[in-house]
Amino acid sequence: MDLFRKKLAVLDLTHGGIPIARKLAALGNDVSGVDVYGTVDQALLGELEEKYGIRCSKAPLPVSDFDLLIAPVHLDPAYPMLIKARSEGKTVLSHHEAVGKILQADPRLSEIKIVEITGVKAKTSTASLLADMLSRSFKVVLHTSRGLEAWKAGIPFLIHRGLSITPGSILIAVEKSLEQEIRPEFFIFEISIGATGTADLGILTTLSPDYGIANNTSLASDAKLQLVLNARPGSTLLLNAGAEKALEAAKGSLAKVLTFKDPFCSDSYLKLADAPDFVLETESGAEKNLTLHFLRRGEELFSASLCPGYNSSAYRTAFVAASAAALELGVGLEAIVSVLEEFRGLSGRMQEKELNGVVLVDNSNSGMDILSAEKALEYALLKKKDEKKGNIILILGEEASQVCEGLPPGSVQGFLEKFGTKCRHIILVGERMEAVAAENASYAGSLPEGLQKASELAGTEDIILSSVKCFR
């Protein structure tokens, strides 16, 4: 079904619905927007109607007025318009599917290859490494939770900051790039909870840990299978070999299917009839530096010696996925090795820094969860032991205003009960963390405030560990 001269209702203007509604209106559709959560400012709703002709409502609208609905995969199926649509047999497209149809119909993109990356973990790291690798031979635009960047010869240039990774943000990323006359050979999009189906190469980093969406009526892993189920014939899928659900879905796909072994997944979890196409093996070298050995179908293609100064083991999924993708897209081995050996970690993703002369292990990012916080603490404790450091000052929590899926206070409470005594002091960030209790804890309203408090508390031999869920 095309999206031209239709009567459409776009549900959820909070999580990426606004750019979808604007684009559909510009394409000649009669568009209404529904502010499902009632969070959009009335002035903005008025602007959408006055400037773009998009009628907006905070209440459900009659489904019979529309040819089809467009709703996000995370919307509760008990929402009245969705209930009515099912009873009337009305078509409901996901935000991902709608964006895919818009992109496929855009002639400006006909000569540009698209890479889409989804998953639970390692999306941003995989996307960033791949952008660096591709940029050694091609012009690249990268859109991730870190921002919209143009990459050339290994150097990123910021185009725009502040976009989310909802599918609707892809439309803004494309417009902002082309407005500045940046016409890449590759667009790389990090996408939350699924894919649009327009990719020349689709990458699934991980499906675990899984979690409920749509008021816990479905699983995020099922939504992410859009990457596989909507893949274009002739395109390529690069899948985590431990994602059994995705491999099963790919059996009937007309796309080329490749797999990589997730270094964090033990062999017992692999249920493949065939061995993974790509495998990464690691070897500890002098001064605890890691050497990577990259194998394709059992044959070693290259090795790379990694830089110190960050927790390289935390990036192993990204290393193998990005390297495999780069090979598939025509990047030479020399460029891939160069990127891996020059890499020093991404800000907020287990990168080591200094804060006023004190070691800072930075693990604050949009994908941070309680398991990530545990692994970061394990790393900090090992560093403390090996380097004979002092105490650990932990900053833990969320900047809820920026991230939709926050850090559950119950999980934080359990974490502190289990590990709290291993830290001299814990600074809890975010309003919801005030419900969490610990003897050695204090509270901060934001990550910058938490870092300031930690800096004041820490001695020169201490370690500050920052694990806050936020956009960076």
UniProtKB/Swiss-Prot annotation:
Involved in the biosynthesis of the unique nickel-containing tetrapyrrole coenzyme F430, the prosthetic group of methyl-coenzyme M reductase (MCR), which plays a key role in methanogenesis and anaerobic methane oxidation. Catalyzes the activation the g-propionate side chain of 15,17(3)-seco-F430-17(3)-acid (seco-F430) for intramolecular C-C bond formation to yield the carbocyclic F ring of coenzyme F430. Belongs to the MurCDEF family. InterPro entries: Mur-like_cat_sf, MurCDEF_CellWall_CoF430Synth. NCBIfam families: F430_CfbE. One of its GO terms (biological process) is methanogenesis. Keywords: ATP-binding, Ligase, Methanogenesis, Nucleotide-binding. PANTHER family: UDP-N-ACETYLMURAMOYL-TRIPEPTIDE--D-ALANYL-D-ALANINE LIGASE (PTHR43024:SF1). This is Coenzyme F(430) synthetase. ATP binds at G119, V120, K121, A122, K123, T124, S125. It catalyses: 15,17(3)-seco-F430-17(3)-acid + ATP = coenzyme F430 + ADP + phosphate. It comes from the Archaea. GO terms for molecular function: ATP binding; ligase activity. Its EC number is 6.4.1.9.
